[in-house]
Amino acid sequence: MFYETTGFEITDSLESNWLVIKEELTRLQPKNFMLWPEKFLYNHGWNVFGLYAFGKKLEDNCSLCPETTKLVESIPGITTAGFSSLAPETHIVPHVGYSKAVLSCHLGLIIPNDCGIRMGSQTKKWTEAKCLIFDDTVEHEAWNRSYHPRIVLLIDFKKANFQSCLN
């Protein structure tokens, strides 16, 4: 299930600073990224550069992206954050997330045509400089059918910190 982003003040901060975030992303090397750990969800091409994992700050990675880290740390209840890259012709199979306590936010940074995400019966496309917020405990899948990588800033945060936005 997707949520309207207008009620979430975090999206204003992320969207207005998207070029700063993208600039830090472009300074990273491919070797800085690692395979997404749940390899059963994809055949190839899903890589991540983590900043936070399950509430733990990844200090070395955060030092390479100081401005992005500051923005991420301003989000109440942050649990996970990092750059998520889908290589060309990659498909993440339908799956569900683990916790009803968190919501996910994707900020579009490098978005070629023919990329999308399906959440339940809804399908959306990422847009550069715009956020999508969703509950990943609803079955979802994502794809990049283009010949260029798709990269978003992925953030998971505790739902309880944003109850007023969910009504």
Q: Over which residues does each language-model region extend?
A:
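Short, surface-exposed charged micro-motifs
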Residues: 82, 106, 141
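Residue-level recognition of conserved beta-strand positions in structured domain cores
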Residues: 85, 96, 119-121, 144, ...
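Short, solvent-exposed loop/turn segments at secondary-structure junctions
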Residues: 88, 138-139, 158-160
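A short hydrophobic beta-strand segment most commonly corresponding to one strand
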Residues: 104-108, 131-133, 148-164
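Conserved metal-binding segment of the jelly-roll/cupin
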Residues: 125-139
